[in-house]
Each structure stands twice: as C-alpha cells, then as structure tokens.
C-alpha cells in the first residue's frame, strides 16, 4: 500500500539447507511492481515504481546482478519507457519485458501497454534493448508469464478494471494466440 516501504534487498534461497542468505542490496531506491528475469547465470531487474515522499512514480532503469561477485551493474534503461506491473521472461539467451502500466501517463499517452522488448545481455551500451513486434494480445498489467521448453506463455492480468483471459505463446520469433 501507499504507506508501506518499497524494498531493494535481495535474498538467495538454498534448497538443500532450507535457508536464506542476504545478498547485496540494489544500489538504488526500493521499488514495487518491478520485473525480473535471468540470463546466462545473472539476474536482471527493470521497471517498477519508486517512492518520492508520499507519492510514487514509474521508472525504467535496468540492473544486472552477478551472484558470483555479489555485485550490481547498471545496464541500459528499458527502451519501452517507464511502467510497472509488466511481464518478464527469458528464452534463447535473451530477456523479454513487455506490457504493464504507466500510471504517470497523461494526455493521449495510453497508461496500459502491449509492447515487448528483447534484452541482449551481450549488447553494446546503448543498444541492449530492441523492440519485438507481433504480439496481438490485449494491453495489460500484472499479467502472468512462464516458460516451458524455451517457449514463453503469457496470460491473465487487467486492463481498465477488466480481468483478461487471453492466452499467448512466444518462441523467440513468433507470437501465437492459444485458446482462452
């Protein structure tokens, strides 16, 4: 809620010991409704909302966490702009982020998003994010994404106080609508 702290801490879970160990905190203000994905043994956090006094605003910064060194590195800002409640997944050595809501949108800018972008962890600075076309689903925020055998599936979420039930899959090249 509005009166709660936004967090920037990171924890690692050891299944064999059933225990948690605190890792290095993100070196930025705490946030909520951010998304994360993992590629090549590193974790990535992007978008979300941060607090500024009693209000909050959406962000687009992207951070890489390296568990081998317990360090964070700033990467290119998410090319799709500020938002929270997006979707994220990784397939084929790339991270993907899309949809979400820019609660700061004004005028003719739509608050709800239906775009997707691919993150290349090996890309040169300034060119790590690239737009991905072909998604024909609804604009949404707080949807669900999962990956099975290098195919991403997305579904659910909300748009203008409407629950969404469309179901899509993405193989890294093509989007296909499945049965709702």
What is the meaning of each model-derived region?
Residues 1-180:
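Kelch-like beta-propeller repeat domains
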């Amino acid at each position: 809620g509005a009166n709660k702290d936004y967090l920037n801490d990171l924890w690692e879970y050891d299944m064999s010991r059933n225990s948690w160990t605190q890792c290095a905190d993100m070196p930025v203000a705490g946030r909520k409704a951010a998304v994360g994905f993992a590629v090549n043994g590193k974790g990535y956090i992007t978008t979300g909302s941060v607090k500024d006094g009693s209000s909050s605003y959406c962000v687009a910064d992207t951070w890489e966490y390296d568990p081998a060194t317990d360090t964070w590195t700033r990467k290119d800002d998410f090319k799709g702009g500020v938002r929270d409640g997006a979707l994220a997944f990784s397939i084929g050595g790339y991270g993907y982020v899309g949809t979400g809501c820019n609660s700061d949108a004004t005028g003719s800018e739509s608050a709800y998003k239906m775009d997707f972008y691919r993150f290349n962890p090996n890309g040169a600075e300034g060119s790590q994010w690239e737009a991905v076309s072909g998604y024909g689903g609804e604009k949404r925020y707080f949807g669900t994404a999962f990956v099975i055998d290098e195919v991403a599936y997305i579904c659910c979420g909300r748009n203008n106080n409407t629950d969404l039930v469309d179901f899509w899959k993405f193989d890294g090249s093509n989007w296909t609508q499945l049965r709702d």
